[in-house]
Amino acid sequence: MEGFMAKKIGRREFVKKSAKIGITAVLGTGVVSQIIEGSVRVFEGEHIDIGVVTGSDYYSSTIKAVDLIGGIKRFVPKDSRVAILPNVQRWHPGTYTKPEIVRSVINMCKKAGAKEINCLSWLDRKNWEATGLAAVIKEEGANLKLVEREETFFKPVKIPKGKALKEAWIMKEFFNNDVFINMPVTKDHAGNKFTGTMKNLMGLNFSTSNRSFHKKDWQTDKNAIEHLDQCIADLNTVIKPALCVVDATEFIITNGPMGPGEILKPQKVVVGVDRVAVDSYCKTLWGIKDEEIFMIKFGYEHGLGEMDLNKVKIKEKKI
C-alpha cells in the first residue's frame, strides 16, 4: 500500500496525472455507481441488513458490527482501491466521525488486501487535523487526498432519475477507486433535521453544486426543505456505497450540523448496505418520526432501499 499523503490535489497534480494515465481514466466512464456496482459479494451466512454494536471501545465495535453483516471481505476485494468518506465538517464533539472508527475501517481494509486506501475531501486540512483524523490516517499508512474547490477537479455527472437535481459535480479523484465506504456521523441538521448516510454524499459533490440544494429559507420553509432533501436523494441515485459505517456513538441533536450542540450518547456503531434502512434506523435513536425526514421517503421512492424497519433484519450486540 502507498504511504501517507496529505496534500491538496491541485492543478499541477491533475495535469500530471492526466498526461500519465490518460484523461479518460481520470474522468471515469458512465454513471458513478458503475464503479462500485457489484463490489458486494454474496454472503452465504445469515442475512443481516443492519449490524449494530453498542460499547465504549469504538474500534472493536466497528469490527464486530461489520462482522455481523458478513465481514469486510464481503465488501473489499483483494488489491482494490478503497475510497473512504468520513464526515469532518467541524471539530466540535458529536459533529465528526470518530478517529477510532476510521482507524478500524482502514485496518479492516488492509487485512482484506486493499492495495490503496484513500480518504477523500474538499474540506480544509484544519478540519482533519482538529478532529484527530489526519493523525490516524497517517499512522495507519492510508492517504488523505484533499481536493481543491475548483470546477477543474470535479466531473459533471447527469442524474437521469433526478427530480430536483439534474446534474452533480463529483470529485474526479473519486473515480480512481474501486470500492466506496461511506462513513458519516449521524446528527442534527439546521434544515432537514437529520444527517446520515445519504446526506454525507454531498461531501463528494462540488460545493457550488451543493449550494444549489439550498433555496431561500431552507431552514424554515417546508418547500425549501423538501427541495434540499429531494436533491440529496437524487444525488444518491448515481453513487452507491459498497458499505455504510455510521458513527452513532455520540452526536449533536441541536445546532447541527456544525455544533456545538446538545449531545446524545447511544454509543453505537451502525453498519449496512441499504442507505435508506440505515438512516431510518439512526433517526430512531433520538425519536425522529418517518414523516419528519423527507430525504428518507424520497430515497425509498427512488428505490434506494427500505424505510420500513419492520421489513429490515437488524442484529444488535453489546460489548
Language-model segment annotations:
Residues 2-319:
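N-terminal and secondary-structure boundary signal
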